[in-house]
């Protein structure tokens, strides 16, 4: 029986220069694997707690030495000797060991790092790729990437209110071709922005961060880039938004679009989106309303839920209980999946299974603070999520996930690229 021999953690750096945890697990056959935990910029208030040191003399208070120490002492002590391939049992032990609903004691960053490293070590010991270990024989589907090519909001220091303007390459036969087309659109967009004397510096997730007069102009220039690159807008490459509305809302559920000097209530903001959807081939809107604006979400879902994908990120924070509430209230029709919002691989799996059971789409997602770790690429294929958000075709921490997906596609001798079939379920 494979058991856990050792567990340890190290403070390393993420893509924004902030500290994060690298956890390592060694098994009884001396197999070793590590995992690096990501971190978000715009975070939902109900996310599992990321433990920081708050020592202002180190990393402006963002150090993670306490979380590392929790791995190196408490977690290590309780996990040594446990069966390695029983992921659910080990993850449940981690949850019980913490004793809070949001990992406030040990830190979700400490717990997730160990959970990820354990899955990777077990797969390695069994000589299986991670996607096959987690997903079994049914892990065959390459996800449609949602590439963030213009950044705004908290991901960029510019005048755009919406956090992400994305492209989705739906009309292709393979992941490789879809990614190639996306990269060509990205480079074409850069030339267009250069021609408009716009900034082509990039945001946290590799997208450009130009200044525009309103929130419509990015849709226009992206549409131009798609067509100039030689692709059919809406047919081969569609558009998607992450509004990150929780960053725009006040206590009265009024939404402040500072770039346009507008203040809109929930119904007015939904009407604003409907104009966008009528004019542009937008197939997905994420966090269109605040995480606390459940009434507004119900209206948004009623108005647009049959036309496009409505993704809950801050709304659900990868939490099965919150997702169940959304299901019961007919709110949204898709969920963003971020393992560090919930704490362990097993809890993430539970949420994905619940979503799939109720025909909610799942979008595997990175965070704005990432690393070279490509775990989510395998995870997306393992669970056949059908979609993945992992940034633009720039910045190596984003490219690491795309390169891993290319590798998986090759191993699967093509696999199945879901493409246009993604939105034909209903």
Swiss-Prot record:
Q: Where is the active site?
A: 205 (proton donor), 338 (proton acceptor)
Top-level taxon of the source organism: Bacteria
EC code(s) of this entry: 4.2.1.11
Give me the comment on cofactor binding: Binds a second Mg(2+) ion via substrate during catalysis.
* Entries under NCBIfam families matching the protein: eno
Role, per record: Catalyzes the reversible conversion of 2-phosphoglycerate (2-PG) into phosphoenolpyruvate (PEP). It is essential for the degradation of carbohydrates via glycolysis.
Q: What is this protein called?
A: Enolase
